[in-house]
Design a protein with these regions (language model features):
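N-terminal beta-alpha lobe that positions the nucleotide/phosphoryl donor
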Residues: 1-273, 277-296
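A basic, amphipathic helix-loop patch mediating RNA/tRNA/ribosome contacts
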Residues: 8, 22, 403-414, 543, ...
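Short, flexible turn/loop "capping" segments at secondary-structure junctions
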Residues: 158-161, 234-235, 385-391, 522
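Catalytic cores of soluble metabolic enzymes centered on carboxylation/carboxyl-transfer
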Residues: 258, 300-515
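Structured functional modules or segments
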Residues: 513-571
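Conserved beta-strand residues within beta-sheet cores
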Residues: 30, 153, 195, 207-209, ...
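A short, polar/charged loop-to-alpha-helix boundary motif
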Residues: 230-237, 297-305, 422, 553
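Short amphipathic alpha-helical segments
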Residues: 4, 165-166, 242, 389-395, ...
Length: 571
């Protein structure tokens, strides 16, 4: 089947990735954008672009609007990317009803794997091990009772969707009610459904996932595994293919479990079957946690070690081609290592707290060279928005040799070459992860980043391997400068002094005028107010939640710095 056009129902780096893959197959591509996202680079990379009604993520989640855009632009296929509508069975059904091919799994598979409780039941039926848990949406009372049975800790998860949103661990019974409410709120905002379920929490586990692809003729194969144990608050930050230091016999058992599960469901398109490997004991027990019925953010590392273009493969399978047509009847053998580091626009506090960084990029120069790939959408002058995810780019490095330490060093060096100015990014944080002995020795687990976040959030100490604008601009401080001509290093000393002066940026906090003797508490970020949890006259304690603000798809709690009485609430 040849598509007349492919509409990409997404934005940013993944929309660009899909557009290029489709264009290389000779397909016409159409981008969509919300009214406040017209300046995003994906609108220029695609052959055409159509504006959606509405602002922010809501526009990209409007099924009728996306279908109408496809019909108006003459597209008979839609690629959803990841996030947004990618895992909504309702959207796949709407595409079918409109005579448009949904490039992804069937609506039935989306419905099954989009309901994490049903997916657990299906895993058990396929003889795939799962964590102890409750296979349905639970109430707060049920979650509290489950915690009572497992006081070592439980994890609350959104019943729909993934990406770490609506997912939090509970290790203290006193925190359960607040965390439960936060998970429900995040799940509702991200997926439109507030339902959550619970499982036993594994504090020392590796996250291993298997890449599956199935065609419409009943054939299914795998493309190896990835390790995604480097996570901050259940969100992946660094991914690896293949998983280093994984016992070969264990690797094969996990892959066989994923393939068996996919075959039991006659799975079609790309899919990722995810497992936790318990490292607290023998390190040989694994459990299924979820299947993501879509293209993954980290598909890139699998591409680099197998040489298979997963996006093109997904499009071709949707067009009716078989795995044999794609030369994928037999699993591809990985070569070397690939590492992906997610570069986010954010500011990290000394305590590891994270705030999204919004504003204008004044410089954007990604690294390059052999074995260095960057999937991003930044450019000089791009103005970001808190309405969307903070991911700016993915730096992917690959090596041909089976030397994981060398791959780590290469990834760290590539990040020092990434010039991002005007906004804060997490490159130092990523460099610290990649250079840490635990990471290089492949001995980390899913809580490792959170346990070491204060160390990882500190400046990396690595030298930036790029020239900033200030180093070469006219009037940079040399003209008319007085230096000691007898000192051969005087110019360098003067240059360093001028750069230090430029870097001294004064941050102006919001000024809140309140009653005499009161101290204002302001939101440290721009965003949408989710809730105000204090009223005039309330007595509050230090650390007590006062409000919740949502920005870049994550909720941030604003807490009191000290005990006091609320005298005024302003918005």
């Amino acid at each position: 089947m040849t598509f007349s056009g492919v509409l990409i129902a997404n934005r940013g780096e993944i929309a660009i990735r899909i557009a290029r893959a489709a264009q290389d197959l000779g397909l016409r591509t159409v981008a969509v954008y919300s009214q406040d996202d017209a300046a995003s680079l994906h609108t220029q990379v695609a052959d055409e672009a159509v504006q959606l009604e509405g602002l922010g993520a809501r526009a990209y989640l409007n099924i009728e609007g996306v279908i109408a855009a496809a019909q108006a632009s003459g597209c008979d296929a839609i690629h959803p990317g990841y996030g947004f509508l990618s895992e909504q069975a309702e959207f796949a059904t709407a595409c079918a009803n409109a005579g448009i091919k949904f490039i992804g799994p069937t609506a039935e598979h989306l419905g099954l794997f989009g309901d994490k409780a049903r997916a657990r039941e299906a895993a058990i039926a396929a003889n795939v091990p799962v964590l102890q848990g409750i296979d349905r949406a639970v109430t707060l009372a049920e979650a509290q009772a489950f915690f009572g049975q497992h006081p070592g800790g439980i994890i609350i998860k959104a019943l729909a969707g993934g990406g770490g949103r609506g997912t939090r661990a509970v290790t203290n019974a006193a925190d359960l009610a607040e965390i439960f409410a936060r998970c429900q709120s995040e799940a509702k905002a991200a997926f439109g459904i507030e339902d959550v379920y619970v499982e036993v929490f594994l504090p020392k586990a590796k996250h291993i996932e298997v890449q599956i692809i199935g065609d419409e003729h009943g054939s299914i194969t795998h493309l190896g595994e990835r390790e995604c144990s480097a996570q901050r608050r259940n969100q992946k930050v660094v991914e690896i293919a293949p998983a280093p230091a994984l016992d070969e016999e264990l690797r094969q058992r996990m892959i066989e479990a994923a393939v068996r599960f996919a075959q039991a469901q006659n799975y079609q398109s790309l899919g990722t079957f995810e497992f936790l490997l318990d490292t607290s004991g023998s390190g040989s027990e694994f459990v299924f946690i979820e299947a993501n019925a879509r293209l993954q953010v980290e598909h890139t590392v699998t591409e680099e070690v197998t040489g298979v273009d997963l996006v093109q493969s997904q499009i071709r399978v949707a067009g009716g081609e078989s795995l044999s047509d794609l030369d994928l009847a037999d699993p591809a053998t990985p070569r070397g290592f690939a590492i992906q580091a997610r570069v986010n626009l954010e500011t990290l506090g000394a305590d590891g707290s994270v705030l999204p960084s919004a504003g204008t990029l004044t410089a954007y120069e990604p690294p390059s060279g052999p074995g260095v790939r960057v999937d991003g959408f930044g450019y000089n002058g791009y103005q970001t928005s808190t309405a969307f995810d903070s991911l700016l780019a993915k730096v992917i490095v690959s090596t041909k040799a089976d030397n994981f330490a060398a791959a780590c060093a290469k990834a760290g060096r590539a990040l020092t070459e990434f010039r991002i100015e005007g906004l804060s990014a997490n490159t130092d944080f990523l460099q610290n992860i990649l250079s840490h002995t635990d990471f290089v020795e492949a001995s980390i687990h899913t809580r490792w980043v959170d346990e070491n976040v204060q160390t990882l959030a500190s400046p990396s100490g690595q030298r930036n391997r790029y020239v900033s604008a200030q180093q070469g601009e006219p009037g940079d401080g040399f003209a008319g400068a007085r230096v000691d001509t007898s000192d051969p290093l005087a110019l360098f000393a003067h240059d360093a002094e001028m750069k230090n002066r430029r870097s001294e940026v004064v941050q102006e906090a919001a000024v809140i005028t309140g009653p005499d003797g009161s101290v204002g508490v302001s939101s440290p970020i721009q965003g949408t107010t989710v809730s105000v949890d204090a009223a005039v006259g309330d007595e509050v304690r230090a650390g007590q939640q006062l409000a919740v603000v949502e920005a870049m798809k994550m909720e941030h709690v604003i807490a009191a710095d000290f005990d006091g009485i609320v005298r005024q609430v302003t918005m």
